[in-house]
Design a protein with these regions (language model features):
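Sec-dependent signal peptide cleavage junction
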Residues: 17-27
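Aromatic- and charge-enriched surface segment that lines or borders ligand/interaction sites
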Residues: 77-140, 177, 268-274, 329-335, ...
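Extracytoplasmic/peripheral linker and loop segments enriched in polar/acidic and small residues
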Residues: 152-154, 164, 341, 345, ...
Length: 521
């Protein structure tokens, strides 16, 4: 098992109480505004929230969740688990259809579609971002995946494996079987994830390299609640009810109309108030103004904005930003333990979260990366089990000015000796399409520079792109210090450890204290 490296500062924030308007009036069309465009329709390779949301609307999975969070049949009518042989056998619903973007039927959905998807996913040349989740639980999948990979220079190639060794089989057209590596009590929750979605083999072969390319809505098939009937990048997306869907009678919205505007976060509230769109996220500042306005007070309601996403501030140990931001100097600074500890105690989490929740910021702060109420056993919440109970019970306010300055004073002397220059430039980008992120960054900048001094640190707040932010900024390493998030891939707390393993997008394994004398992690 890979070594877990804890590098995040302030594993804390669940954005649970942003205000969002209710639907303005009854309509068969649901209209929204958006500023972050998708960059791929390939649900088997993507790993971005925007593209997950699209896939969830247009691709059905074996099971689904009801409004109570309970697993219910979807493309699988029923299933059985054989504990002795570690197999899950799913009975696929007969009559489910694949349709094209214009709604015409292309083929039946069969068990073979899930096998085809697995083979595509496990071909390392297709560069799926979620293949690791699949091969972590399915027998033979990791060995097959490694056998398709290209060895690094000086590395021996892995043995090429036959796909028959992978634990996914179509017993017949409507019987699908998975064999697990080991018992996995949360496996049913995993099959709702993108890496377990099906794909039609004939269509996949027909499209070839164009499968899932985000230039046309005709580059994927649809079997879910909606069809992406119109796709004009950076203009509009229209989802139309899939009349052939097996559960069509329970799809109550006829169309979803999404209009692109790079200023969506700014324009959406007033467009909603004028009745031009049906929902909009609004900041706490706007919420306060509207609640004081009798004509608007009834238009809004609080919502749990981000479900079970948690937010944390991360240091980047492999900076790849422009020279003007002094990445080499940042490397020296971030590799100093006392420098990092200074920020742990120096960041006033309550003050930064007042941008999102001015009345009760403590309500959206916690001490565990796994949020409360995510999973419980015998009525006991996971965050209240064992040693986690002590961590949960700690004060959420970690700010301690005296300790922060003590650590920073030590760090400054150590960094001078190591050749660092001051002030240390800290590039902190944000996604302009995310409500109040810019304001939060400004608060953090002012608070931290006010504490440590602008002669010690220079936090540079910079807007990243609205579309493709994850790829262009976080995955490219173009940040020093940034708010990041993580959402669950399946219903087990283990899913929240992923951002803190080696090989993630803040590269904790490159921290010098984790390297041996040969520079190997």
């Amino acid at each position: 098992m890979k070594r877990i490296v804890a590098i995040a500062l302030s594993l804390c924030v669940l954005l649970s109480m942003l205000v969002m308007p209710a639907v303005a009036e009854e309509s068969a069309a649901y209209r929204t505004l958006y500023s972050g465009e998708i960059t791929s329709l390939n649900y088997l390779t993507t790993a971005t929230t925007n593209e997950f949301a699209l896939a969830a609307n247009v691709i059905d999975t074996l099971v689904e969740y009801d409004k109570y969070g309970q697993v219910q049949p979807s493309l699988a009518e029923s299933w059985e688990y054989d504990a002795e042989n570690l197999t899950y056998t799913f009975k696929i619903r007969e009559g489910a259809k694949w349709v094209k973007a214009d709604g015409t039927v292309y083929a039946d959905v069969t068990a073979n579609d899930f096998v085809t998807a697995a083979k595509y996913l496990l071909d390392a040349q297709n560069a799926s971002s979620t293949a690791n989740i699949f091969y972590s639980v399915i027998a033979g999948a990791e060995a097959y995946y490694l056998g398709t990979s290209t060895p690094e220079e000086g590395q021996e190639p892995y043995p090429v494996m036959d796909f028959e060794t992978v634990g996914v089989k179509a017993i017949d057209d409507y019987t699908l079987q998975y064999t697990l590596v080991e018992p996995c009590p949360y496996f049913l929750s995993m099959v709702t994830y993108v890496c377990f979605m099906p794909v039609n083999a004939e269509f996949l072969a027909e499209k070839g390299a164009d499968f899932g390319v985000a230039t046309s809505n005709e580059n994927i098939l649809y079997n879910g609640a909606f069809v992406l009937s119109t796709f004009e990048p950076q203009q509009k997306r229209v989802y139309t009810k899939n009349a052939t869907n097996w559960d069509a009678e329970n799809i109550l919205i006829e169309t979803i109309e999404q209009t692109y505007n790079k200023e969506a976060g700014t324009l959406a509230p007033e467009m909603y108030a004028r009745g031009e769109i049906d929902s909009a996220d609004i900041s706490s500042t706007i919420a306060a103004e509207w609640l004081a306005d009798e004509t608007k007070a009834d238009l809004i309601r609080p919502v749990r904005q981000s479900g079970f996403y948690t937010y944390f501030v991360a240091f980047n140990f492999d900076p790849n930003f422009d020279a003007e931001y002094e990445p080499e100097n940042w490397k020296i600074a971030v590799n100093n333990v006392n420098f990092r500890k200074a920020f742990y105690y120096g960041l006033d989490r309550v003050k930064s979260k007042m941008v999102m929740e001015p009345d009760n910021p403590e309500a959206i702060l916690f001490n565990t990366v796994t949020p409360p109420e995510f999973v419980s056993i015998n009525g006991v919440d996971y965050t209240e089990m064992g040693a986690l109970a002590d961590i949960t019970a700690l004060e959420t306010e970690t700010f301690n000015e005296e300790k922060a300055l003590e650590y920073m004073n030590v760090a400054v002397e150590e960094l001078k000796a190591a050749g660092a220059t001051f002030p240390v430039k800290m590039l902190m980008p944000y996604n302009p399409s995310s409500s109040a992120w810019a304001e939060e960054c400004v608060v953090m900048e002012q608070q931290l520079e006010g504490l440590f001094g602008t002669d010690v640190i220079d936090i540079i707040v910079e807007a990243g792109p609205s579309s493709g932010f994850l790829k262009e900024v976080r995955r490219s390493g173009k940040y020093a210090f940034m708010k990041c998030n993580w959402g669950p891939d399946y219903a087990d707390p283990n899913t929240y450890t992923d951002p803190f393993y080696d090989g993630t997008y803040n590269w904790p394994e490159l921290a010098t204290e984790y390297l041996d004398e040969n520079g190997v992690s």
